[in-house]
């Protein structure tokens, strides 16, 4: 069936009118109670407590990503994302994953974009303090565990992910 322009325009206009008429004109206020504070080292912490669930999402977002990298010198944010999952001085190789499994955590992962790098996982509520300690350990005590062999291996992993579009 071929529609003429006037009929199409009329039908299209009616659909737009009805869509606007059906939309709610009153907005529902949505708010989430949270605490926000800044640590002595400049780290901003946003804390929200939800007692309706037995698990807690632990998510860290760092304002660093590929947009801050120079042409010809890219991939560093993603490389650091990988390195931070490997080892720390206090937890050892694979220690973060082992600790997470021991306390019932799941979904540990990370992601890097143009303007941020995220690390996240879910843990039982009673394990939150342990996981925050483990995340702090990961951020503060991984660098001395990185040697040339580890660095080269992770560079290849990141390059491979880039080739695959991951």
Residue ranges and their predicted role:
Residues 29, 62, 88-89, 95-166:
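Acidic/histidine-enriched segments that form metal/cofactor-coordinating
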Residues 22-98, 120-123, 129-136:
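His/Glu-rich zincin catalytic helix
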Residues 1-11:
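Bacterial N-terminal signal peptides that target proteins for export
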Residues 9-19:
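Bacterial N-terminal signal peptides
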Residues 2, 15-17, 38:
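Acidic/proline-rich low-complexity IDRs
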């Amino acid at each position: 069936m071929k529609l003429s322009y006037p009929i199409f325009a009329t039908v299209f206009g009616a659909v737009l009118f009805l869509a606007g008429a059906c939309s709610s004109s009153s907005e529902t206020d949505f708010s989430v109670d949270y605490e926000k504070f800044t640590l002595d080292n400049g780290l901003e912490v946003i804390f929200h407590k939800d007692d309706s669930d037995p698990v807690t999402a632990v998510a860290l977002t760092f304002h660093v990503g590929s947009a801050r990298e120079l042409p010809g010198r890219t991939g560093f944010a993603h490389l650091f994302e990988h390195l931070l999952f490997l080892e720390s001085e206090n937890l050892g190789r694979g220690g973060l994953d082992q600790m997470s499994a021991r306390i019932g955590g799941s979904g540990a992962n990370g992601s890097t974009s143009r303007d941020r790098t995220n690390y996240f996982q879910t843990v039982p509520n009673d394990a939150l303090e342990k996981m925050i300690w483990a995340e702090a350990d990961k951020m503060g005590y991984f660098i001395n565990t990185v040697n040339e062999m580890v660095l080269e291996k992770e560079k290849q992993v990141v390059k491979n992910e880039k080739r695959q579009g991951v």
